Structures are given as C-alpha cells and as structure tokens.
A protein has these predicted regions:
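Active-site microenvironments in enzyme catalytic cores
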Residues: 1-12, 21, 32, 42-254
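Catalytic-pocket segment enriched in acidic/His residues
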Residues: 14, 69, 95, 202-329
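Catalytic Cys-His active-site segments of thiol-dependent hydrolases/isopeptidases
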Residues: 26-33
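A short, polar/proline- and glycine-enriched secondary-structure boundary/capping micro-motif
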Residues: 37-43, 267-269
C-alpha cells in the first residue's frame, strides 16, 4: 500500500484522515473499514473503525500490525466496491483529484538524518578543505532534525529571511512501525512500516558559519518547513528500499539522478545504530542523507525564489514543492 494522510474540506472545516492511493484516487481507509465491519454485522462499526484506523498516522503505526491488516482489508473492500461507491451512511470512500489535499504522511515523533552517501559527504567536506576521514567508514552517523518544522507534498516553502543560499537535499527515509532497543541488523526491517521521500532544506551560508565555530547544524536547518516528507509511505511488500532510483528536477529540467546503490551503510545498519542503547518508537523517521549529487552544493547550481523542486523516487512517487518569498534585502 501507499499510505497517505489527507484532508477534506467540510462545513465545519478541514478534516484529516488516513488513506491509501489507488490510481488517481485516495481511499478513506477508516470509512471503508467501517463499512466492511457494518456488512459483517459488527455493532458500533464506525467507532471500532476509528479506534483501529485513527486519523493520526503515528497513532495508526502504534497499532501495527493490527492496523495494517485492517487497512489492507479496507483497501481491498473499497476496490471491490468501486470508485463511485458511497457507504450506507452516504460517506465517500474514494476521493478523486481536487477533492482532497495530501499532507505530510505523518508528523514524526523525531527525525534522525543519517549521512551514508560517500560522494555527497566527500563533496560536503571538500568545501571546508578537508578529506573524508577513515573513521567515517566505521559506523553510520546522524544529526537530529526539527520534527515540528514540517511540510508536505505540494506545499509552498518560504525562503528563510536570514539566508542567501537556500539548498534542497534529496533523501529517502524509513518510517518505523514498531518500537525496540538494541535491534540487530538481521531483524531491523521487521520494525519498518515503509519508506518515503525526504527533503532536508539547508541554509548553506549559515551552515558554513556554524561549521567554522564548531557547531552542528542549527539555524541552517532549523526553520519552519525545513523538513518535507511525502507524498506517501510505501509499505515494504511493494518496494525494496535498497533498490530505488531517484530523479531530481528543477522547473521541469532534470538536474541529477541517483540510486540507493550509493549508500555505504544499509538501512539495516542504520536501524541497528539508531536503536543502540536507545529505544526507538513507532513514528520515528530515519533518513539516509543526501543522495550523491542530490543538492545544489554538489551540483554547483543554485535555486532561486519561484522555482519548483521535484524529487521523484521510482515506486514511491514525486515530492514537489515551490519556493516562495524572496532573498533577504
């Protein structure tokens, strides 16, 4: 499944739901599951459906694997009913283009952003006149991100007022469905719900200043909408996270291509590292770091306000955002 969080306009305002993509439609999984339970004669079917498939993705993941099984049942049930079907109460099950808005698929508990692409790291530290140390190859390393500074597919991204050099970073990220501690690499993927696209925005001039004083990323990455996730979470029965082709476009022009083959540490090693001596939780997001040539810094080409950034990952979809606002005066 391709799991999404979406909103629908109603007379009482925006209502947020969990869904799954079916061609150009979004299936309301809770509504479909409630109808399924009703047909089976379950008392209080809508209430039970809301309990098992809640409107919040992190809460949904916390009910894994029961919630996943319910979602799969609902998805199959809805497809059998057809895209024009309405529930006995008149509720829509399918939403077509323009009838709903995709949001970030989840509001993560936290984001750990790893750096496992060798060429990207080499280029990043080359800007500082340094070489990649042997120590980098011993274990995957990460920095924490502001999980509250979040945006989703289609959102306009405001150019931060304090930077001259805004940069995107094309990454993929695993979304966790189970919690645990000291997880071995051989068991790691059993804890994963799926994979999504992650854009880690960076203010490069500010980042350079922070590096000069020996500080980790601060305001260079910590601003509203600085983390973009979407368009969906693809469950692992539909995709191999270690075999994903990525295409970067700016205003429709292809700027770069990449592949998860460039990762020097595996997803399993990332999870093993993240959980070492530390409990991880459903709704945690672990990102790969930028694909090789997946940012302006490496490409030597810089974006401007008004440009649209498209990050396509085969098997996942396209994460598209436009930059609005202006550079500081």
């Amino acid at each position: 499944m391709k799991l999404v969080t979406f909103s629908v306009s109603t007379q009482v305002g925006e209502v947020v739901r969990i869904g799954a993509l079916h061609r150009d439609f979004v299936v309301d999984l809770c509504a479909a599951f409630g109808w399924h339970l009703c047909e089976r004669g379950v008392y209080a079917a809508p209430e039970l459906a809301n309990d098992i498939i809640p409107a919040d993705m992190v809460q949904f993941l916390s009910r894994w694997p029961m919630a996943r099984e319910a979602a799969e049942t609902a998805f199959s049930f809805a497809r059998n009913k057809g895209t024009q079907a309405l529930s006995p109460s008149g509720a829509k099950i399918f939403y077509g283009p323009g009838e709903c808005r995709l949001l970030a698929p989840l509001r993560p508990r936290r984001i750990k952003d790893y750096l496992v692409y060798e060429e990207h790291k080499k280029q990043a530290i080359k800007q500082k006149g340094l070489d990649l140390p042997d120590l980098w190859y011993r274990m995957p390393t990460y920095t924490n991100r502001n999980h509250l500074g979040l945006a989703g597919p289609g959102d306009d991204i405001a150019w931060p007022s304090y930077t001259e050099k805004l940069d995107f970073e094309f990454e993929l990220a695993l979304v966790m469905a189970r919690g645990g501690r000291d997880i071995e690499a051989s068991d790691a993927m059993e804890f994963v719900a799926g994979i999504t696209i992650y854009n880690d925005w960076s203010a490069r001039d500010v980042q350079a200043d922070e590096a000069r004083i020996g500080a980790g990323p601060g305001k260079s990455k910590d601003f509203d909408q600085g983390n973009v996730l979407g368009p969906c979470i693809v469950t692992l029965d539909e995709i191999d996270p270690s075999n994903v082709e990525m295409i970067l476009r700016v205003d429709g022009e292809e700027w770069a291509r990449g592949h998860t083959r460039g990762m020097k540490f595996s997803w399993q090693q990332i999870i093993e590292n993240a959980s070492s001596g530390e409990t991880i939780f459903p709704g945690d997001v672990f990102a790969s770091g930028t694909m090789d040539r997946g940012c302006c810094l490496e490409l030597g080409r810089w974006i401007e306000p008004g440009m649209r950034i498209e990050m396509e990952a085969k098997g996942i979809g396209i994460l598209s955002n436009r930059i609005v606002g202006s550079r500081p005066a």
